[in-house]
Curated annotation (Swiss-Prot):
Its EC number is 7.1.1.-. It is a multi-pass membrane protein. Keywords: Chloroplast, Membrane, NAD, NADP, Plastid, Plastoquinone, Quinone, Thylakoid, Translocase, Transmembrane, Transmembrane helix. The lineage of its organism: Eukaryota, Viridiplantae, Streptophyta, Embryophyta, Tracheophyta. It is an enzyme of class 7 (translocase). GO terms for molecular function: NADH dehydrogenase (ubiquinone) activity; ubiquinone binding. The gene is ndhD. This is NAD(P)H-quinone oxidoreductase chain 4, chloroplastic.
């Protein structure tokens, strides 16, 4: 057990500091904004410092563990810890939340509440990634939903209430399955109920019961991933949410579902996962094609980007279903990669909306002349999204391909079919991304309108865009920086399938 409660501080600090902001005298929106940014930067620095000095990359076991008694009757403790699977997502959360707070500068209405909700969401997300107790994971999972609902319903577009209601119905409804699974798995096979993830990882179940647990967790976790047909809340939510909220949704929220699939379904229920992995592969493959085919038909700019997120999440599902070292490593790398790329695209879509107040692509055109900096950044990040070599998306998708090829679980004809369908999806990706850029920036539609002028990116927006672009290029050039964090943990998880 760790001597100093680093993880408790990292989890509790954002929401505690945010609560303090609600009681401070109202001194104007700028004070609230800079206070929140300072909290996020300080949190990120504390997290980075704690991990640099306490995390050992060659140790697949839980590190920096903390265990404080809470409710003895349920064996419910405040258990926190990190490993190679969670460290990358925690750092991603800190980085994206800090930039999303900076992106939220134009928000002026109820600024204190808005920034408090962002900090509360920050705590919930880090708590989910660092929980070593199944019920604590569920509580953090739910804690993070409330700020998203309020951010969407209070600072969204014209249909924000519809989108917020749809979001909460999907996510809260699926959480019922998560709660049933948590209670069922903790009560089974032991005289005393246990919620400790490390103990549950060594627990065996009857095949039928393990399958039932697996299905319950899959329904709960894949709503957030999201997997078709449970994805329909996502385009509506992205279409109406403020773009700083979209950055948090695309960059972090979707990754929580994928993280849960690895942490719970793969690690706790290996036999059921082995049975259901072909279905995950099939759904992931269909998802890539379906979302890539649906995206070009979306008039709303943010909805088109949302469908591209659904398509890219298909690669993560395939990597998880492959049950191979390259496949799972590729899925983890894609979680980090798409966290940056998705957040960046939504930020640029939002800054474009701030200037022209248009959301439909068929009303845009000719913006490249007026806003060349935004045009350049949007083009570069679109290239990153379509997996251009040298960018993080290319490496992640390539490693997932290797995972399918090297899988011993599937017949050659099945692997060829999966790769062929994935290749079609990869071909469709530049079609909808490049057509989106063409509709926004080329032509003469807006450039011919008299007395219409746009301001290009200011220092804040340019700094934010470059800050997201640098890790995308960095991971694309040197992916081992991320892969080395999780490689030992991946081997430890997969040992349950080949040696367990």
């Amino acid at each position: 057990m760790n001597d100093f409660p680093w993880l408790t501080i990292i989890v509790v600090f954002p929401i505690s500091a945010g609560s303090l902001m609600l009681f401070l005298p109202h001194r104007g929106n700028k004070i609230n904004k800079w206070y929140t940014i300072c909290i996020c930067i300080l949190e990120l620095l504390i997290t980075t410092y704690a991990f640099c000095y306490n995390f050992k990359m060659d140790d697949p076991l839980i590190q920096m563990s903390e265990d404080y008694k809470w409710i003895n009757f349920f064996d419910f403790d405040w258990r926190l810890g990190i490993d190679g699977l969670s460290i990358g997502t925690i750092l991603l959360t800190g980085f994206i939340t800090t930039l999303a707070t900076l992106a939220a500068f134009p928000v002026t209405r109820d600024s204190r509440l808005f920034h408090f909700l962002m900090l509360a969401m920050y705590s919930g997300q880090i708590g989910s990634f660092s929980s070593r107790d199944l019920l604590l994971f569920f509580i953090m999972w739910e804690l993070e939903l409330i700020p998203v609902y309020l951010l969407l319903s209070m600072w969204g577009g014209k249909k924000r209430l519809y989108s917020a209601t749809k979001f909460i119905l999907y996510t809260a409804g699926s959480s019922i399955f998560l709660l049933i699974g948590v209670l069922g798995i903790s009560l089974y096979g032991s005289n005393e109920p246990t919620l400790n993830l490390e103990l549950l990882a060594n627990q065996s179940y009857p095949v039928t019961l393990e399958i039932l647990f697996y299905i319950g967790f899959v329904i709960a976790l894949t709503v957030k991933s999201p997997i078709i047909p449970l994805h329909t809340w996502l385009p509506d939510t992205h279409g109406e949410a403020h773009y700083s909220t979209c950055m948090l949704l695309a960059g972090i929220l979707l990754k929580m579902g994928a993280y849960g699939l690895v942490r719970i379904n793969m690690e706790l229920l290996p036999h059921a996962h082995s049975l259901f992995s072909p279905w995950l592969m099939a759904v992931g493959t269909i998802q890539i094609i379906y979302a890539a085919s649906t995206s070009p038909g979306q008039r709303n700019l943010k909805k088109r980007i949302a469908y591209s997120s659904v398509s890219h999440m298909g690669f993560i599902i395939i990597g998880i279903g492959s049950i191979t070292d390259p496949g799972l490593n590729g899925a983890i790398l894609q979680i980090i990669s798409h966290g940056f790329i998705g957040a960046a695209l939504f930020f640029l879509a939002g800054t474009s909306y701030d200037r022209m107040r248009l959301v439909y692509l068929d009303e845009m055109g000719g913006m490249a002349i007026s806003i060349p900096k935004i045009f350049t950044m949007f083009t570069i990040l679109s290239m990153a999204s379509l997996a251009l070599p040298g960018m993080s998306g290319f490496v992640a998708e390539l490693i997932v391909f290797f995972g399918i090829i090297t899988s011993q679980k599937y017949f050659v004809i099945s692997k060829i079919l999966i790769i062929f369908v994935m290749a079609i999806g990869i071909i469709l990706t530049p079609i909808y991304l490049l057509s989106m850029s063409r509709q926004m920036f080329y032509g003469y539609k807006l450039s011919n309108v008299k007395n219409l002028s746009f301001f290009d990116s200011g220092p804040r927006e340019l700094f934010l865009s470059i800050s997201i672009l640098l890790p995308i290029i960095g991971i694309g050039i040197y992916p081992d920086f991320v892969l080395s964090l999780a490689s030992d943990k991946v081997e430890s998880i997969l040992s349950n399938y080949f040696y367990g």
